A protein has these predicted regions:
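Alpha-helical metal-binding/catalytic segments enriched in His/Glu/Asp
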Residues: 39
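N-terminal accessory interaction module
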Residues: 23-24
Length: 187
């Protein structure tokens, strides 16, 4: 299921480049769909696991019991694990930053990447919108995941992610000719 792994990374700022090895560890890439299918297939083997495909309207907790209200009915349990942004989060002092991503897998015309070294955090970007960095995870000499990450109070327009990625690829990676393979917007 692991499609690639790295044991060495760079951390970059405008005045620092630090390369470090993970020693006994490695950073592994797993495609989301592969993980999803593995867990789904594994879970279906258990009699006490039921999958429901319904639109969730609300999630609440009352007296240590979790309630999930859907368009079809209401479900209860001790725990509810929610990995989706079902509702617009309220920005307040306890929840003041949103983590946002947009990542492109790019393919270059000529070898442009060292597959042994990833850039885990490249802070050589403007920081006016919040804590902003890129990471670059090369999987071949001609392909890499380039991902823009931002912690801020407001969600950017999709065009702003596009411009940031294009500028980074051109200005920082020094790549002029590339194609975007699959494209993903995550929030």
């Amino acid at each position: 299921m692991v499609t690639h792994e790295w044991k060495e990374f760079e951390f970059l700022t405008s005045d620092l480049t630090k390369r470090f090895k993970l020693e006994h560890y490695s950073y592994k890439m797993i495609k989301g769909i592969d993980f999803y299918n593995l867990v789904l297939n594994f879970s279906q083997a258990f009699e006490h696991v039921t999958f429901k495909y319904e639109n969730v309207k609300q999630i609440q907790i009352e007296n240590d019991i979790a309630f999930v209200e859907t368009e079809v009915g209401r479900y209860t349990g001790e725990y509810v694990f929610n990995s989706k942004n079902l509702f617009n989060p309220e920005i307040n002092t306890q929840n003041s930053l949103l983590q946002q991503f947009e990542g492109w897998v790019i393919r270059t015309k000529k070898p442009s990447f060292n597959t042994e070294i990833g850039a885990l955090m490249d802070f050589r970007l403007h920081q006016e919108r919040g804590a902003t960095f890129m990471y670059v995870l090369p999987t071949t000499a001609r392909e890499a995941l380039v991902e823009y990450t931002l912690f801020s109070e407001k969600v950017l327009d999709k065009e702003q992610y596009k411009v940031a990625l294009e500028n980074y690829i051109k200005d920082n990676l020094k790549i002029e000719a590339y194609e975007i393979i699959p494209k993903g917007y995550l929030f």
